[in-house]
Every structure is written in structure tokens, then in C-alpha cells.
Amino acid sequence: WESDLHKTLDELRITGGEPMMSPSLWRLLDWFETQREKVNPKMRLAINSNLVPKRELFCKFLEKVKNIPNLHIYTSNEATYEQSNYIRDGMDYTSWYTHLVNLPGIRPAGIHNMCTVNALCLESLPEFLDDVVKNKKAWKRVYDVDFNFTLNILRFPSFQSPLVLPDNLRTKFKDNLQTWLDKNIEDLEPMEVAHTSRLVDYLDIVKTPHSEAFDLPKLRADFKNFYKQYDERRNKDFIKTFPIIGEWYNGL
């Protein structure tokens, strides 16, 4: 049945790790170049990438996929610059953003960014979403390419949840997001409005990450111990990178 699967397959999803690091991805893309006429013409090809491979590899990827119909590219980020690099160890935000803005030129069917909403990203999340909306409007106008985002609230590990933050910071970040939503709501998809409203409500109303693991003093102790070790082992600096949350962190 494997030899006939391509005739009836409706969607093929490629995730990772980073797919561009796998020889299997390149073999598949080579197959698409020579056998495309055999594929179900309505098949949706979804590829999830961190978008930070070496430039040469990324350019090779663009060349390979530029003629694939119904191509959807997924990536993940939720903060800007050094805060993004801190949260996602190994991230190079400048490289990520440079590669992101190259994507609409190949005219995929859709580009999707998945945000994992944790305590740390809340400092620069509105700024990050500003860039998303700016590109969303430009790419639709110039390339007729759809770009959207999801806000997926982190639940585990519990000590990285937004709910570990003190009430004053949660209120501050909630208000920032509500202001952002009010300003940009006309440019958002219904799904994006729903995700942003849900996060605003979550920061405002929800008090415990989940009942089985809620011990706020312990979670905050774990938060401090984890990032202290993270700084030492990865040569990072929490307080310098997150000046708003860092003031509270320094007092734990």
C-alpha cells in the first residue's frame, strides 16, 4: 500500500527536530520534483521548521519547495531578540526573522507561527505580535500569502507557567495584551482574536496552573533554581535579559 499512498493522501506533515537536518526530507523533496504529477493535487504538505539552519541550507530548502502546491510552513517563536534567544536555547532571532520574511517570496499556501506562552515571553510578546501583524498585512497585499499565529499556553513544567508570576506582573502583562488586542483586532482572524482573548482571561482569572501541581512557593523556588542553573550552564543572564521580570526574580 505504501507505493500507492501518494495517490490518496490528503495531508503530509513533516516535523522534527529540524527537518532540514534530516536526509529523509531532501529525499522526499527530490521525489516531489520528479514525481509531482503522481501526487493527489489537493494534498496539503505541512513542514515545521525552527527556521535557523545555516543560510545555505535554508536557501536550498526554498529552491526545493517553491513549486510545491498547497505548501504550509509552520514555525515557533513568542518573544523578540535576546529574550527569544534566552527562552529557546540555540535560537538566533535575527536569523529566524530573516528567514521568516523570505518565506512569502515562494508563495506558500500559508505560513503559521505557534507561540508557546510561558512566563518569560510576556515581556516582549506584544512587540513580537506587532511584527506578526505588520507582516500579515504586507504579505497578503504583496504576495497573497496568509500568515497567522496561535497562542498556546504552557502547562508543564508548571514553574514556567505565566501563573508563577506575582499578581502585579500578571496584571501588567494582561493589560498590555488587552491594549494590543484592542489596537489590532480588525487585522486578526477570529481564531487569533479568540486565542488572545483567552490569554488575557487566563492572566486575569486563572490562579492555579492545575490543582495537582499547585504549590506556589515551591513553583517559585523551582523557577529560581532552574534559571540560576540555566544561566550558569548556558552562559546566560536572566536579570539583564528580562529587566521587568528580573526585578521580581532577583528578590526570590
How should each PLM-predicted stretch be described?
Residues 178-252:
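Radical SAM enzyme core and accessory elements
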Residues 1-8, 39, 67-68, 99-111, ...:
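A structural motif corresponding to the C-terminal end of an alpha-helix
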Residues 30, 34-38, 59-63, 67, ...:
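Polar/charged alpha-helical tracts
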Residues 117-123, 141-177, 193-203:
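Flexible glycine/acidic-rich beta-alpha junction loops that bind and position SAM and/or redox cofactors
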Residues 7-25, 35-58, 65-98, 110-119, ...:
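Core AdoMet radical
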Residues 77, 93-96, 125, 170, ...:
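A structural signal for well-ordered alpha-helical scaffolds and beta->alpha junctions
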Residues 28-31, 61-62, 88-92, 127-132, ...:
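Short secondary-structure boundary/capping segments
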Residues 119-136:
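Catalytic cores of alpha/beta
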